[in-house]
Structure formats: structure tokens, C-alpha cells
Curated annotation (Swiss-Prot):
Important for substrate specificity (site feature) positions: 12, 74, 158
Protein family per UniProt: Belongs to the Maf family. YhdE subfamily.
Organism: Caldicellulosiruptor bescii (strain ATCC BAA-1888 / DSM 6725 / KCTC 15123 / Z-1320) (Anaerocellum thermophilum)
Keyword Cytoplasm: yes
Function noted in UniProt: Nucleoside triphosphate pyrophosphatase that hydrolyzes dTTP and UTP. May have a dual role in cell division arrest and in preventing the incorporation of modified nucleotides into cellular nucleic acids.
Residue positions of the active site: 73
InterPro entries: ITPase-like_fam (IPR029001), Maf-like (IPR003697)
GO terms under cellular component: cytoplasm
Compartments it resides in: Cytoplasm
PANTHER family (UniProt xref): BIFUNCTIONAL DTTP/UTP PYROPHOSPHATASE/METHYLTRANSFERASE PROTEIN-RELATED, BIFUNCTIONAL DTTP_UTP PYROPHOSPHATASE_METHYLTRANSFERASE PROTEIN-RELATED
Cofactors, names only: a divalent metal cation
Protein name: dTTP/UTP pyrophosphatase
């Protein structure tokens, strides 16, 4: 069985992968996740996912190459602006006000590096989300849950944030942070399949 590495410490991504009953290791990447506003959001998520996977792959390549690295990066796009994770309450407030009462797009880039062949696949998934109109008081109440601070766009669709998401068009798991359908399509291109319960 191939050694599977998830290049992320995200609790959401870990839980999503765990549900398939496959064994995997968690080796978080340590890259600079700064957003390049001169690039498209698609280019940003794919570039960041690839950097994460490549960094972890390079750490392990001297041991042996019988492993598979999976990395992902999620960003939000609204009115021409790319949103990452807020670094403080003011930034979270600004982001939540920005997405309040309108549609925005969530993009997740996924990169898989197949160790034995050093084959690299990078793709992305897009979902559209409509956030209900929130008063400043509601925004502050949501921020007080502390949920926004490690989430792109300052909300979690599977937590308290589910109470502000009015509609979604596209893959739900993409908004959580790991588009499972897209991930499995990519794995199938490399000869693997999550449906089989092993890699």
C-alpha cells in the first residue's frame, strides 16, 4: 500500500479524508501563503497548492519515493478581490461585510504528487455561495465565536457559518476546503480510487 501524505494541518481536510477509512500521515507544509493580487484566483489557488505539495515532497524524497502527497489551498473571490484568511478581528469584520448579502465564489486548488513517477497534477474547483445580509451586530456576534480566523473569507460553512449561508451552487466540500469529487477524479487519472478504500 502506498504511503499517503496530507500536506495540511486543517482539521476540516483531515476529517474529510478520514471518512474513507484509508491510512494517511499529516505533514503540514510551511510555505508563505501570501496572495498575489496580480494573478487570477485560479492561478493563486493552484500555485499555492503546488507549492505546499512540492515542499512536503522535497522533505520526503530522500527517504523513498513510494508515497503520494495531497495538498490544497482555498480562497474566496468577491467583486474583483481575492480573500484569504483574516489575520485579526478588523480584517474578519471587513471580509464578512464584503460578502454579506451577495454571491461570492470559493476556489480550492488541489495538487497531487505521485512519488514513484514524480508526476504532478494540479486542478481547481469552484463553488458559488450566497451569504445572507448581516447587520454589523450579527457580524460581530459571529466573529465572537472565533470561527472566522483560520478560514478563507472569514467563515466556515460547516460550523456557525452554516447559519449565514443561504444558498450554494457547486461542491459543498469545496467550500469546506477539499473538493472530494475533484480529488478522486485526479486520483483516478493516476490509477488510484478512493472508492476502493486503499491507494
Amino acid at each position: 500500500m502506498k504511503r499517503l501524505i496530507l500536506a495540511s494541518s486543517s482539521p476540516r481536510r483531515i476529517e474529510l479524508l478520514k471518512q474513507f477509512g484509508i491510512e494517511f500521515e499529516i505533514i503540514p507544509s510551511n510555505i508563505d501563503e501570501s496572495i498575489d493580487q496580480s494573478l487570477s484566483v485560479e492561478e493563486n489557488v493552484m500555485q499555492l497548492a503546488k507549492k505546499k505539495a512540492q515542499e512536503v515532497f522535497n522533505k520526503l524524497r530522500e527517504e523513498n519515493k513510494h508515497f503520494l502527497v495531497i495538498a490544497a489551498d482555498t480562497l474566496v473571490f468577491v467583486e474583483g478581490v481575492i480573500l484569504g484568511k483574516p489575520s485579526n478581528e478588523d480584517e474578519a469584520f471587513w471580509m464578512l461585510r464584503k460578502i454579506s448579502g451577495k454571491w461570492h465564489s470559493v476556489y480550492t486548488g488541489v495538487c497531487i504528487i505521485d512519488g514513484p513517477r514524480e508526476r504532478i497534477l494540479v486542478e481547481y474547483e469552484k463553488s458559488n455561495v450566497y451569504i445572507k445580509h448581516m447587520s454589523d451586530e450579527e457580524i460581530l456576534r459571529y466573529i465572537s465565536t472565533k470561527e472566522p480566523f483560520d478560514k478563507a473569507g472569514a467563515y466556515a460553512i460547516q460550523g456557525f457559518g452554516s447559519l449565514i449561508v443561504e444558498r450554494i451552487d457547486g461542491c459543498f466540500y469545496n467550500v469546506v476546503g477539499l473538493p472530494l469529487y475533484r480529488l478522486n477524479i485526479m486520483l483516478q487519472k493516476l490509477g488510484y480510487d478512493l472508492m476502493k478504500g486503499e491507494l
